[in-house]
Amino acid sequence: AGVNGSGKHNNWSLTTDDGINLLEPGKTPHENIQFLLVLTCILKAVDEHADLLRESAADVGNDERLGGNEAPPAVISVFLGEQLQDVLEQLISTGTATHSKTGEILDTGVKTLPDFMKDATDRNRTSPFAFTGNKFEFRMVGSRDSISECNVVLNTIAAEVFRDACDRLEAADDFDTAVHDLIKELSLIHI
């Protein structure tokens, strides 16, 4: 018999003291350099410190639940959705992103129902760390566990990468070129 259980979603985002959500992609994410820099820094943080993030959700009961008869798996992965994945792939392949995918019209096939727009950000229910519109959902934490440990880990690993990015950009002769190159480099290495 498989083990089933319940977990919780830790909705994690970064907001400035002025209330600006740094994970808000806007209507044209391919043009939102601040968002792309923050996003790719977080990808690096999760990629390089997946072990710490995994440990933050580890305990005997939760380890039996993860990867069993329900999602998410016990392995850390990041899901960005079609829109952001496409933007980063454009950067990698051509050096620039020229457009962002938008939601498609979803044809219900029922004449009495109107067509409606499908969300371009998707929702992947199996990834333990998924981007969902303007935040990440960390889905590994057990239902009885506190989210405090995973938040300490997320904040710390992100802060380390932000510090490194700031040091590099502050030392650059041409900020615009340096930030573009950094976003492309982080995309290439960490997606």
Please identify what each model-predicted range represents.
Residues 1-3, 7, 11-123, 130, ...:
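Loop-rich catalytic cores of soluble enzymes, especially ATP-dependent carboxylate-amine ligases
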Residues 17-19, 136, 143-145:
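Short, glycine-/Ser/Thr-/acidic-enriched flexible segments
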Residues 21-24, 139, 147-149:
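Short helix/loop capping segments that flank catalytic or ligand/cofactor-binding pockets
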Residues 105, 143-175, 179-182:
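A conserved active-site cap/scaffold subdomain adjacent to cofactor or substrate pockets
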Residues 120-122, 137-140:
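Beta-strand-rich recognition/accessory modules
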Residues 123-128, 145, 149:
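Generic recognition of flexible, low-complexity loop/linker segments
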Residues 133:
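Peri-catalytic and regulatory segments of divalent metal-dependent proteins
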Residues 189-191:
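Conserved small/polar residues in nucleotide/adenosyl-binding loops
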